[in-house]
């Protein structure tokens, strides 16, 4: 049986993203040379929300892009197991990242493997001056030496728990961060 516990509701997510937006601005001393890149899928929507808040706070339209890490993963998934053709969705970074302070955005930080793949993919696009990481939820259990620079909420979990982020933009359900516990 699976038990679900809501650890962040819509209001908590909004507050966390507002705080993270201020932290990004403060740490980067404004928005000069700043860019946001969301990791598909939910990272894209979170990057857009951070973009909107930074625009409201600073009045500056920071460039936003998204990155597909499919070909960079060490657990490559395939759209067809027979042909072993990877399910690639495409990267959309409509600006030059060279010399930019890029904030990679994702929903949950777990082992660090997704972030490693995203950094590899980003470096194939260009050479940013800095790469920072913003996540809505950090659940621990790292397998690689990667940490988030901006965290919405630290959510300690056990090995049999899973953290799920639901966003209205993609899931057609109310915004929430949920821990699914196997009992």
Swiss-Prot record:
The name this protein goes by in its record: Bifunctional protein PyrR
Residue stretches spanning the membrane: none
Alphabetized GO MF terms: RNA binding; uracil phosphoribosyltransferase activity
Motif PRPP-binding per record, residues: 102-114
Similarity comment: family membership: Belongs to the purine/pyrimidine phosphoribosyltransferase family. PyrR subfamily.
GO biological process, one term: DNA-templated transcription termination
Keywords of the record: Glycosyltransferase, RNA-binding, Transcription, Transcription regulation, Transcription termination, Transferase
Gene that this polypeptide is encoded by: pyrR
């Amino acid at each position: 049986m699976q038990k679900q516990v809501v650890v962040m509701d819509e209001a908590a997510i909004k507050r966390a993203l507002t705080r993270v937006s201020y932290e990004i601005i403060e740490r980067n001393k404004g928005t000069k040379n700043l860019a946001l890149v969301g990791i598909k899928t939910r990272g894209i929507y979170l990057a857009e929300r951070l973009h909107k808040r930074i625009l409201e706070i600073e009045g500056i339209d920071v460039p936003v892009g998204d990155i597909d890490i499919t070909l960079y993963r060490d657990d490559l998934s395939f759209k067809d197991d027979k042909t072993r053709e990877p399910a690639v969705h495409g990267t959309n970074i409509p600006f030059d990242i060279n010399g930019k302070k890029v904030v990679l955005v994702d929903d949950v930080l777990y082992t660090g493997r997704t972030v490693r793949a995203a950094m590899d993919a980003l470096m194939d696009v260009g050479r940013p001056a800095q790469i920072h990481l913003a996540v809505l939820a950090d659940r621990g259990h790292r397998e690689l030496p990667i940490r988030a620079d901006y965290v919405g909420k630290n959510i300690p979990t056990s090995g049999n728990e899973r953290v799920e982020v639901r966003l209205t933009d993609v899931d057609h359900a109310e915004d929430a961060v949920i821990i699914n516990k196997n009992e």
